[in-house]
Each structure stands twice: as structure tokens, then as C-alpha cells.
Amino acid sequence: MKHHKSMRTLGRERNQRRALLKSLSASLIEEKKIKTTLARARELRPVMDKLVTLSKKGNVNAIRLLYAKVGRDNAKKLVGEIAISYKDRNGGYTRIIKLNPRKSDGALMAQIEFV
């Protein structure tokens, strides 16, 4: 039964799901916006909000956690550029825009981007 299971499985096991979200978050940090399925975008949103909140702290421990989550280059970009632009904002750092369904399989698509 699905009692108190807040996360979608995205058709993957736990390690694969973590790797997928790590890859999507790294891509979003690099590109500022990415196009993906709606379910993946909805799962990525809270992950990115937590990463941006963590990067706003800016202390050594937070930066080391960011290194582990998104890699060294992306962590530096997150702390150096993105966190500074959101210093006065308390959450809601990303927006999801629904797009037309994918032609091949009809999957609902969305664009997730920084506000």
C-alpha cells in the first residue's frame, strides 16, 4: 500500500532514481531550464528548492553537501550565481511550464526553469 510515500518511483529503483535526479539537477543548474517529462519535473522541483536553500547558507558544510549532490562545478555555480540572485526569496525558486505531449509516446512534457 502507498501510505505516506511522498515520492514517485519514476519506474526506477532507489539508486537509479537518485542518479536521475542528480543528473537532472546538474543539467538545470548548467542550463537554467530543461525540458523533461511532467512527472520528472514535479519530482525535481523540491530537490532543487532544497539545493538552492542549502546554497544560500554558504558555509563550508553546505558547500561540501552540494559537492556530493551536484558536483564541484555546479556547486560553485549554485553558490556563486544562483544563491545570490535568490537571497531575498524564501522558496519557490523554480517554475514548471506544461508543454505539448511528446509525439512518440504521448508522454506529458514540461519545462522546469529558475524563476
Each model region followed by its residue ranges:
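Structured, basic alpha/beta domains of bacterial-type, RNA-associated proteins
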Residues: M1-R12, A19, S23-V115
